[in-house]
UniProtKB/Swiss-Prot annotation:
Pfam families: PIN_9 (PF18477). GO terms for molecular function: magnesium ion binding; RNA nuclease activity. SMART domains: PINc (SM00670). Toxic component of a type II toxin-antitoxin (TA) system. An RNase. Belongs to the PINc/VapC protein family. Mg(2+) binds at D17, D88. CDD domains: PIN_VapC_AF0591-like. This is Ribonuclease VapC9. SUPFAM superfamilies: PIN domain-like.
Amino acid sequence: MEADRGRNNKVRCAVVDTNVLMYVYLNKADVVGQLREFGFSRFLITASVKRELEKLEMSLRGKEKVAARFALKLLEHFEVVETESEGDPSLIEAAEKYGCILITNDKELKRKAKQRGIPVGYLKEDKRVFVELLD
């Protein structure tokens, strides 16, 4: 189901994956703005994902390098949280710990999050955020 302007009061924060942050620049999608419209007010990123973006900024070229740089600038709107795990597991850990939705376009990560009872969201091809809230 598409998010209906934040009618589910249980989830007010979002943990966002690297692939979504890169997508924002490459596809001109206003993910943070859409999530705010849906009632989300807290945006988290794990320190592990921030480090991943910093590495990508140094190693990529062209549009992807600019996208990584843009994503790092976008993090001004995010709270960076520490986790015990690294990479994708850090996103699941943070979503569980803080009671957040996980926003990712990674199919495997979405599957793992759903198995653990974490609501997920992702970007559709038309640049809209699609949110699957749990009952």
